[in-house]
């Protein structure tokens, strides 16, 4: 490693994160940085918050400082020490890299030894020097972002406080409280299943004991299973639409293109996206919406490395107390904006708006997605009557106009919402979905589809069978003359309208 002259900080340099970080874990020179299992797929990083946990006993001998020095962002005796920024830089690098995935985000109740667990992803052989890789570099691009952020505040879209009085359009949600079995309850906060925090206690002088606990959590279930199913799953899903995760929504938060949090919610009524310390209560339904909604808090901006970006992001989060409701009604998805912060969006039901900014009016129910419309367009696409597959992704932009000429990655706060059932159906017919046991998390939803939707699924199933005649594979069970009360999972008319 070449060193610059004394007193002159080295310029930002390209560093291949995966080999560097794996080597640091193997070196065992940083306290607490260690492999979780013998396969060296999961590793543990102590993740202290200086403002909440005080200074570390190990001083500045951390992997965060080492990364800052390796990337040329910190030089001993020249730059002022900034542990918070070092930590944010490494987290951003991990989030941007395709070689790592956050597996477990540690307990949420401020434990004495907070930590994260990352997974090393298998992306084939390591790239050579001439091949593209997920290098991490800091330089001119971030400096340009700083200048752009400095001019941003006057253009942030924040409304004046709403005047007292009834909302423009009333909204209501189903009152029934659906109970889900614990085994089917999805984690809130991460895409992969989250192990029990009580079993994932941080090591305290006994790393061996910590490793003995983890396999008991990690081995069972879909993460450890890689055997392909003995029968094709797709025909069963189309025969029995209630096997599709109709209430599942994938939600991805992004702060200027960096994703601090991705999660899946399965509440049959929907969710509320908000940022506040105030809890929704039954007595404050008019302020925060029904308490039966999944309450999803925006990620903290504390790990944003840029001071200016963090400042402006906080300006918007401060007026997101009441939040944005995503309401599931029948087979449609709606948005109800309660917050003072303006919200703009794009999605399947907004195509007519083109590239012009598309705001969500405050306290007015706005239709975002229709499963019936998606199924009709999917059938037309599969028959070759349309050239493009039906869209299903929904994007929200908070406090800035969208769509416009500015790319989404440059917006302060964006949220992507994906109806999981639509994504699965499209992937089934495009051949993009790998039907291994760990590729789909099946859930049973209430069979509340309308009668004509059953006909749409039967037509999709017929198209699927036609495709399979072109290639040899295990045949699905015969479905001739099938009606809604037949098949391996019979559909009953309970709940249909």
UniProtKB/Swiss-Prot annotation:
Disruption phenotype: Mice develop normally and no overt phenotype is observed in hematopoietic cell population. However, the induction of pro-inflammatory cytokines, such as interleukin-6 (IL6) and IL12 by various TLR ligands is impaired, whereas interferon-alpha induction is normal. Belongs to the IRF family. SMART domains: IRF, IRF-3. PROSITE patterns: IRF_1 (PS00601), IRF_2 (PS51507). The keyword Secreted does not apply. Changing residue 434 to A: Reduced homodimerization and subsequent activation. Homodimer, when phosphorylated. Interacts with TASL (via pLxIS motif); interaction takes place downstream of TLR7, TLR8 or TLR9, leading to its activation. Interacts with MYD88 and TRAF6. Residues 124-178 are annotated as: Disordered. One of its GO terms (molecular function) is protein kinase binding. Phosphorylation of serine and threonine residues by IKBKB in a C-terminal autoinhibitory region, stimulates dimerization, transport into the nucleus, assembly with the coactivator CBP/EP300 and initiation of transcription. 'Lys-63'-linked polyubiquitination by TRAF6 is required for activation. This is Interferon regulatory factor 5. Residues 137-148 have a biased composition (Acidic residues). The lineage of its organism: Eukaryota, Metazoa, Chordata, Craniata, Vertebrata. There is a cross-link at residues 410-411 (Glycyl lysine isopeptide (Lys-Gly) (interchain with G-Cter in ubiquitin)).
